[in-house]
Swiss-Prot record:
Protein's name according to its UniProt entry: Large ribosomal subunit protein uL14
Entry annotated with the keyword Ribosomal protein: yes
Entry keyword Protein biosynthesis: no
Gene Ontology CC, one term: cytosolic large ribosomal subunit
Known role: Binds to 23S rRNA. Forms part of two intersubunit bridges in the 70S ribosome.
Coiled coil: none
Amino acid sequence: MIQMQTNLDVADNSGARRVMCIKVLGGSKRKYASIGDVIVVSIKEAIPRGRVKKGDVMKAVVVRTAKDIRRADGSVIRFDTNAAVLIDNKKEPIGTRIFGPVPRELRAKNHMKIISLAPEVL
């Protein structure tokens, strides 16, 4: 469950390390984002010579949340950290690699490129 001012780790090699959610997209008064939702983020920490720099405003897809997600079969999945992958306006990832596992709920939200780049799909 991600809301405004939430800090997230970046799970790709775009050059950003930490981002902060500044808006949850989808609906006029939407408060929370979950896995697979698109948010607007501000880059708070970045590495030198990366594709993005500190202060940039970008879109991102939430790929891991500490809040547990209930699946249709009754199982629950949760992660240790909140993490996102930076995307462009065409919903393509900016980085060329994804770090860490991603849930298969991204497939239902049509983020197939992220699923194919991920080392593990839970």
